[in-house]
Amino acid sequence: MFTGIIEAVGNLSAVNINSQGARIVVSTGLLDMSDVKLGDSIATNGICLTVVAFDNSSFSADVSNETLTRTGFVNYQTGQAVNLEKAMLPTTRFGGHMVSGHVDAISEVLRINHDGNSIHYWLSMPNDLAPYIAEKGSITIDGTSLTINALKEDQFRLTIVPHTTAQ
């Protein structure tokens, strides 16, 4: 489980897609890798990935065809920035919400409005997920825990505050 509070931004240093899925290598930037072990989970843009190899500054993970398709990971490219979060511990304080790392859908940004220091994003709402998207409820976008501020037909609005934008 994760919290949706991003610990670091890394970069994809390798993306090797084959018929069974993909093997990726993520350069972890400022993510503390000192306590990482084989088999640990690291959310990468909100996608729960299992560490199959690692060193002090990177980890490798296998990505299934299902994950490639459902998450849009198939379009990711070498050098792309990704949000990173290690799995939470039972003693961890979390300021986001419980995040499984299992991606349900891809949403499209429909429009962006600036309001003072905040930024409002209107996103498309997949029809099959509409019953589960509630105003003032939590949602995870690219691994970031956010609050749904408004609903309108087949859309929902998120507001990003300056602190989140700065991170």
Regions from the PLM with identified roles:
Residues 1-167:
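Conserved loop->alpha-helix
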